Structures are given as C-alpha cells and as structure tokens.
Amino acid sequence: MLNNLTIALDMMGGDYGPRSSIPAAVNAVNAHANLTLILCGNEQVISKQLESLDSLAHPRLIIRHCSEVVTNACKPGVAVRSKKDSSMRVALNLVKSGEAQACVSSGNTGALFFMAHYVLKMLPGVKRPALISAVPTERKNPVYLLDLGANVHCDAQTLYQFGIMGSVVAGQALGCDNPKVSLLNIGSEDIKGHEDIKQAAQLMQQSPLINYIGYSEGSDIFTGKADVIVCEGFVGNVALKTCEGIAKLIMNKFTAALEKHLVYKCMAFMLSPIIKKLYKRVNPDQYNGASLVGLRGIVVKSHGNASAKAFQAAIDEAVKEVERQLPDKIAAIFEKIHSKDTVNE
C-alpha cells in the first residue's frame, strides 16, 4: 500500500453531477485514511453540497474551481478544443502534471476518451486505449471484458494488444500469473467470425504473452471459462449494458414477486441473508468503474447514471490501480515486445 494517494474527480459529469459524486467522495476519504481527493468543478456548488454533509472543512477534500462542464451533448472534438477549463479537462491535467495519480469521471464517454488520449498520450507501443471492467461470473472471480466502447471497430493487431493489456489487468486483480484469455465471437469454431477476429486469434495463439484458450460466445461470459474476454468496442458496450439490464430485470421481478403475497414476504424474511448475498453478487453498482487502459496515466470511467455508492466503487477501483501501478506494468510488457522486435530486426 502506498503511503499517500491523490485522485482527481470530475465532480460535474454524469446525470447527477455533485449529487452523487460528493457523497461518494466523502465516503471514499472516510474509507481510505491515505486518500486525498481533488474535487474539480463549480466551487460554489461543491461547497454547498459538502456543507450539507458537514464535510466542508475536511482536510483531504480539496476543491479546484472549474468554470466549464463537458455535457453529454458535447461532441468530443469540441470538448478537447473548447472546454479547457472544464472539470474533466482539469482533472486530467492534474494527472498529467503528477499532482494526482488518477482521474475518475462519470462524464461524456466519447469526450473523456478523446480528451484523455490528447492530454495523457498513449504508452509507447500501444495503438489504442481500451475500456475494461470486471463482470460477475458463476465462479468466485469475475471476468475482465474489453473493449467496452472506446473503439467501435478494431483491427487484429489492436485486439491482440487488448489481450495483452487485459492479461496484465486480470493478472494484477486476480493475483494469477497466467490468466486465461478468449476472443468473443459468434461461435466457438475456428471458421467463425470476420477476418480481423481470425487474425487476432492467430496472433494470440502464437504469443508467449497470452494464455489464449480460443473463442467465447456471449453465453460464456458468465461461466468463468475465461479470465479475460476481448472484443470490439461496439460489441463490448452492447454486451455489458445487456448484462446490466438483465441483472436489474431479474432483481426487479424477484422483488415484485416477493412483495405480491404474504407467504412470499415471510419466506423473503427467512431467506434475507441469502437474498442480500445474491443481490450483492449481481448488483452492477459494485462493478462500476471501467478503466481506460493503455494511457500514460490512470483514468476510470464511471457510469453516467451512477449513484453515490456506484461512484464510490469507481473511486475504489482507481485506488486499487494506483496501488498496483497499472500503467507501469503495461508499459513494461510493451517495452519487452519492442526490445524483442529490435533484436529480431
């Protein structure tokens, strides 16, 4: 564990802005004694919210005033060129300058992707950054799914690099040296899928850096068959949101059924420890926080509609990645690849 951690938060992003990000920030600094948070956004709004929580004078909550906000309607190019004093841009600049070790935002995904790429730059050798997040499975450990929407279409080399970065993330998070990596496809047979997926499969199969186990279908995501599942951003984003929607549907239907009859209510009371455990297992809030990997800094993207609890989960994810020194670990792997390629030339 590092002695002191500093994380910059985009307080104004997302559907709820400070209404969810400020309670999350207060809870996070209370949970982590070594954590300081720089709250980037409208000082007046932030101060008022902190005061309502009796936390205005908290020594580890530092307000950094920003005069602009990147809205959900803002186009990525406009955000990069014109929103230089936005809460998102200031938070990323703090990571670039070294004043903060990570940035967390629930703002406009496209704008965050382009702005983070522009401000922090790519790690040497990495073609494209990717969004990666944990998804619950039937087994004890989650599966790490990437890309979740940063890149709509990916060529074979990019998918291969995602496999490498996913292996590093899963290896660090799960504490395993050789995480199992799979490509998401429309079938498990070698002949299935388009040409980029087939070529990516060959690259992964031949690589000593990846423990490639073959293709996975959509139904395999939850089985725990793989530790890492790689896909294009369009597919990954649809898959993730479908997973979250199904989880909410099941829990809502289950809750409605229990409340319908007195007998079911009595059963629910007796089974409440099991029900709570199940809900905790599938609740999307605890998995909130997709990491934008491949950059020279740590950026965690929270859901735009994140509750305070969910936004705190994204902060917790950023804390873990700082402690694991994730960008350095990824950079070291790509440096080995570059050194090997140089020797072979």
Curated annotation (Swiss-Prot):
Q: Cross-referenced InterPro entries, in alphabetical order?
A: FA_synthesis, Phospholipid_synth_PlsX-like
> Which pathway does the UniProt entry assign to this protein?
Lipid metabolism; phospholipid metabolism
Query: What class does this enzyme belong to in the EC scheme?
Result: transferase
Give the GO cellular component terms, alphabetically: cytoplasm
Query: Keywords for this entry?
Result: Cytoplasm, Lipid biosynthesis, Lipid metabolism, Phospholipid biosynthesis, Phospholipid metabolism, Transferase
Q: Could you mention a single GO BP entry for this protein?
A: phospholipid biosynthetic process
Give the EC number: 2.3.1.274
Where is it mainly found?
A: cytoplasm
Q: Give start-end ranges for the coiled-coil region(s).
A: none
Q: Which family does it belong to?
A: Belongs to the PlsX family.
Record's function text: Catalyzes the reversible formation of acyl-phosphate (acyl-PO(4)) from acyl-[acyl-carrier-protein] (acyl-ACP). This enzyme utilizes acyl-ACP as fatty acyl donor, but not acyl-CoA.
This chain belongs to the protein called Phosphate acyltransferase
